[in-house]
Amino acid sequence: MRFGRGDFKNLEQAEERCFLLTNGLGGYCSLTLAGGNARKDHALFMGVEKAPNCRYHYLTNLQESLETEKEVFDLSTQRYVNWTKNQHGYRYLQMVSPEDIPEWVFEARGITVRREIVMVHEENTVGIRYRITAPEGTKAVLKVCPLLRCSKKDEEPKESQSYLLGEKTLESDGKRLYYETDGTVVPLKEERISDLYFAYDSRDGREAVGMVVKNHEIRFAVSGGTREYSLIYSDRPVEKTVRELMEAERLRLLKLTETAGFQDPAAVRLVKSADQFLVKRESTGGDSIMAGYPFFSDWGRDTMIAVLGCGIETRQFERVKSILRTFAFYCEKGLMPNLFPEGESEPLYNTVDASLWFVEAVYEYGKASGDLDFVKEMLPNLESVVNWYRKGTDFHIFMDEDGLISAGAGLEQVTWMDVRYEDILPTSRHGKPVEVNALWYNALCILAELSENGHEYETLAETVKQSFLE
């Protein structure tokens, strides 16, 4: 998949699409295809303190400019509160390829700048490679200025926060960020830029203004011909080259697609995309699935639905088992977590359907993998879900006399239509939602097949069927 000059005719068009790289821990690298920040949660380097939902915003972006002996070309794309400061680097974009190792090609006055970005799997590390090609006799310098943030994902940097640049390190907010580059590092007078404007946040009613800090730049020079340079940031000392990091990621993606076994190019792309949402969960030492980037963490409903495509169809069976064990570990009174909030907060359980999707996920895993031992391991959890729903659990979730499941009361949001504005639920859906009872019937049919008490569940399933049809 490639995008060309015709896809970046103006700033609005340059912000329409984004790319996403993830590290399997909840961290990510995500900007617009033109390389800008259209949301405050966009970041060149969003790391993780505790996987997957204690995230840390290290670097917002890299400001890039190409300087010749006569001209300066600003390659960055970004909006500001004062629109006269807007950067229009998309005008120099010739090509963007966002797949696998994303690549950008800029061209100005016959000088070509190629940029590639990689995020290392299960590490807080991001690597950038530049290839600069200039005509014979032409001297040019690519200046790259990191836009520093160094704060928790949903917090602004402190006013008093310092940014200490050392040899191969940057220290701020009690953290040390390591960097490795073959360019020339030039310290700058610290500058706080507090008027970045995020157009898509503004449309959503979110806080649309943000700040970053500049205190150094890296210079990459070329004098005719082609030069290759690299820049790596990590929360640990850098031991590998960008070339090695990229080769390792390509090999990982190749093994992933070989395991899935698909030949169709679209299916192969989907396998790679699905993998971006699989993450480690430190609290259990297992796996989970992110509901979406850049906003969401791992949600129960989303995970149980997504595991069918992100794990089972792609034949990531060990990870599927780990995901199901993770949510079984957190099950309370028959309820799977609705979501794990950003940070250290306890999980929330206001969902009626996540547990029923869990039953379906275990069943589908068993059919696809043939791993009946794991299904037997999970069977007590499946029966616990159904039994709690029968006798009643939290959030007014209970089986009514007709066998159907009723859920929710007051301000409780228990289905996927969970919008709440102050004390108003525009779509409360309290009572007996149709999809919930379809899932309930499905869960009973599954237990009728798997449980030693199958006849009991079969009888109840028939009652539910009749009540549903009536």
Each PLM stretch: what is its role?
Residues H88-E99, G183-Y197, E258-V279, F317-A328, ...:
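An acidic intrinsically disordered interaction segment
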Residues V242-T257, F262, A266-S273, R315-A328, ...:
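Extended, well-ordered alpha-helical scaffold segments
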Residues L196-V212, E217-A221, E228, L256-Y363, ...:
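Substrate-binding groove/exosite segments of carbohydrate-active enzymes
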Residues R2-E12, P337, P341, T393, ...:
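Non-catalytic carbohydrate-binding regions of carbohydrate-active enzymes
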Residues T125, S194-I218, T226, G334-W357, ...:
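The feature captures the catalytic groove of carbohydrate-active enzymes
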Residues M1-F262, P294, R301, I312, ...:
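Terminal accessory carbohydrate-recognition/targeting modules of carbohydrate-active enzymes
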Residues L148-C150, D235-P237, K280, E342, ...:
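Short loop/turn segments at secondary-structure transitions that flank enzyme active sites
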